[in-house]
Amino acid sequence: MQTLHALLRDIPAPDAEAMARAQQHIDGLLKPPGSLGRLETLAVQLAGMPGLNGTPQVGEKAVLVMCADHGVWDEGVAVSPKIVTAIQAANMTQGTTGVCVLAAQAGAKVHVIDVGIDAEPIPGVVNMRVARGCGNIAVGPAMSRSQAEALLLEVSRYTCDLAQRGVTLFGVGELGMANTTPAAAMVSVFTGSDAKEVVGIGANLPPSRIDNKVDVVRRAIAINQPNPRDGIDVLSKVGGFDLVGMTGVMLGAARCGLPVLLDGFLSYSAALAACQIAPAVRPYLIPSHFSAEKGARIALAHLSMEPYLHMAMRLGEGSGAALAMPIVEAACAMFHNMGELAASNIVLPEGNANAT
């Protein structure tokens, strides 16, 4: 059975030759070179992913939603009752939540995964539960390092199993009351930013309670002393099971040489962890949308990412990842279905990259 260390070691590098061939092909399509902008660079990025066999393509699509509760909810950092996590997870199995509707529109399957819901098991939800909620990061660690490592490996294997069954495009999502607090703590640690710069309103926290949330994040970091150079240490000390789960999806997809669409702020924190654990993950990550959560810009700047969509969204669940899946498919369609300049006897002069 593969260990986490072996999985990380075996993440392949992008295929530079395939990317060069893709760029040459795109430059010869029936358009001025570069005129389809980031759709072109996305197609080249996809071409370099070994799991796609050297060409931009999309097979089956899946959004993996990691569901868990958080002990830090007890600190008054969320307005919704904790039971809403379980209620919404059940709603996801019925296809009625935001991510389910958007995923259905994109032709993607939603996998609802319980990695730490504080309730009885829910029919139709994949059970990878570590515990009924993680620890309160304001008073101690979220979980042990061994728990984090075991969950990373389990989710990575689940992701790779889906890849073997034909999934070639993954999206990540989460569900958990109070989870923007540990996400903000992680972003603060990884970027070196003060908590006040990255703490937002989450699911409509009243402005009068923001200062308390900032204080909770600062206390969590001060008490746990996470090492910013050790992604697993940060996840286990100030993260949460849902954040670990999303990180595991990224590691697993990268191991299989396949793309992962990020969602919003929560997924940015997990991406920071994934890239710290294994920098080789970075070329497989695709930013979907620019989260409206306060710390989004700082997290994205640290990841050197510019999302494709600016929709003022902050729902989470993987909604942004699902919404961006058609953009990935559009990049593939451009690559395979457009005509070629040579076939139409069109010769463009040099310097037409910005033509419209």
Curated annotation (Swiss-Prot):
Keyword Transferase: yes
UniProt keywords, alphabetically: Cobalamin biosynthesis, Glycosyltransferase, Transferase
InterPro entries to which the protein is assigned, alphabetical: Nict_dMeBzImd_PRibTrfase, Nict_dMeBzImd_PRibTrfase_bact, Nict_dMeBzImd_PRibTrfase_N, Nict_dMeBzImd_PRibTrfase_sf
EC number: 2.4.2.21
UniProt key word 4Fe-4S: no
Active site: 317 (proton acceptor)
Superkingdom of origin organism: Bacteria
Classification via Pfam families: DBI_PRT
Associated pathway: Nucleoside biosynthesis; alpha-ribazole biosynthesis; alpha-ribazole from 5,6-dimethylbenzimidazole: step 1/2
Catalysed transformations (reactions): 5,6-dimethylbenzimidazole + nicotinate beta-D-ribonucleotide = alpha-ribazole 5'-phosphate + nicotinate + H(+)
EC class of the enzyme, as a word: transferase
GO biological process entries: cobalamin biosynthetic process
Subunit-structure text: Homodimer.
HAMAP family registered for this protein in UniProt: CobT (MF_00230)
Family recorded in the similarity comment: Belongs to the CobT family.
Role this protein plays: Catalyzes the synthesis of alpha-ribazole-5'-phosphate from nicotinate mononucleotide (NAMN) and 5,6-dimethylbenzimidazole (DMB).
Protein's UniProt name: Nicotinate-nucleotide--dimethylbenzimidazole phosphoribosyltransferase
Species in which this protein is naturally found: Salmonella paratyphi C (strain RKS4594)
Gene expressing this chain: cobT
